[in-house]
Amino acid sequence: MHSNRSLLAGAASISAVQAASLADVCTVEHVQASLPATGTFLGLTVDASSATANPVYNASTTGGDFFPAATYDYCNLTFSYSHDGRDDVTHVQYWFPAPEKFEKRYLSTGGGGYAINSGTQSFPGGVQYGAIAGSTDGGLGDFDTQLDAVVLKANGSVNWDAIHMFGYEAIGELTKLGKATAKSFYGMSADEKIYTYYQGCSEGGREGWSQVQRYGEEYDGVIPGAPAIRYAQQQVQHLFSNVVEKTQDYYPSSCELDKIVNETIAFCDPLDGRTDGVVSRTDLCKLKFNVNSTLGLPFSCAATDESSLGFGFGRKAKRQMGPAESPMPATNGTVSAEAVELVQTIMNGLYTTDGKFAYFSYQPGAAFEDAKTTYDNETDTYELNIASTGGEFVTKFIQKLDEDNLPSLDNVTYDTLVDWMKSAMEIYGSTLQTTLPDLSTFYSNGGKILSFHGESDNSIPPASSVHYHESVRSIMYPNATFNASTEAMGDWYRLFLVPGAAHCSANTLQPNGPFPTTNLEVLIKWVEEGVVPTTLKATYEAGIYEGQDAEICAWPLRPIWVNNGTDMKCEYDQASIDTWIYDFDAYELPLY
């Protein structure tokens, strides 16, 4: 039993730290004293001698896709830890807000592509809300080392420690260590709560789901954006467009594909009730747009240093790499029957040769990133350009060969792609697949999930997020009706499809579309104040509505503009919903 003297001393210590300045606490000595002691977390040993601490004053950001502009002070601290018996080192970095700005919040951040972190790119989105922000190198070597560089110990030998760390362990450990350090750093009592959040997009979105599925008791709120879940299918599907080109023996110019994309947008734009250059209803587009209508339409493009399609249309750095960029000559012509067939086949999704469905594709209006070709000056022809994310996944993760891409797609068929998907599921089902549908631990802990996905994402199909939402609903509410289970799940898990948005960013092909830049603020209000996001707040970042606010409908409701396009409402449209629902009969087991 504690004496009154010890209780008073503890209270005085807490009060003193909370009243301290950033300069007082942002020292190596104070950080070392705040680190979790050996034995705090089973199997982890923190190296106190590795700690660094540097105060930063009056830092500012002009804002980004996931946070607004702000000015703030913080303590930039780092340290390393190891796993007992592994002979490894993992580095972590945190920004701790100044003591007077700390709101007892913590935020873990993730990466993109094969990177487990995005550096400090997302940290401002934490400290401006009074939250510690953290990232990890995952024990891969350093903050710049990506998984694909270390996934193999040698040909035929998978680095399973790296797979498990990248898959879910490293972010979970980052969160636990960050919160434990914060308690001492800020002089908090052991039973004081730190609201714990995660935010990430693409690979960062997959990492977010890994935390919900594996560390449900640690988090109060998670924002998984455009997640690269269903990893086996997601990575291999990047090769699907290439295999369609190889199968048809047709390799279109970017200009020809660009024409089809622009015509799709033009036709489908007004289907939502407002003509604004944004395809808000890609489902209606699927129901009403006929790609054959583009046959024979003229196209013309000036020479460019790189392809006009792809990640140039979004402002964020690449998170899921497609084919390499290459210079393109001036091009003109008319849309060919071969191009129409190619586009329709891609949009239909991947089927086996005997007609079984294996995976969905992108929504109409999204750019055909994976179908980009390369131009050969000597032959004056466009040639196959194998999407590197998919190719490298096959060589390193499935074939276990230290090769950065497939040398060719000779003898690769649609069935080959499905076989690769099945093989990857068997190998990485418990680590990278990240589609466990039973979220009972997270739900029981009172956690909230705010998931979002751009409808015109051309790297990770938005149908992927819809399918996972429906998988969770079917497992968590097996005996409830669609409407009842959707309403019940909406109390803690909401999915928002962002009209016109590209991969984890706004879209210059549809510049008048909104983007949700304040998701963490929305989630904080939901978690801490009980303000349910019936719709998701967004902002028009460019175009004719720049600076205005927008609202995004929660799945399964879909946006429709009424009163001559002046008012938006969220409607239930069964025919549209049905376009998002798929039966994967190419697999013997359920594909969540």
Tell where the protein language model's regions lie, with residue ranges:
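Acidic, glycine-anchored loop motifs typical of Ca2+
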Residues: G273-R281, A303
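Short, well-ordered loop/turn and helix-capping segments at boundaries between secondary-structure elements
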Residues: A228, S241, P270, R274, ...
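Active-site rim elements
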Residues: H164-G167, Y251-C255, M328-T331, E455-S456, ...
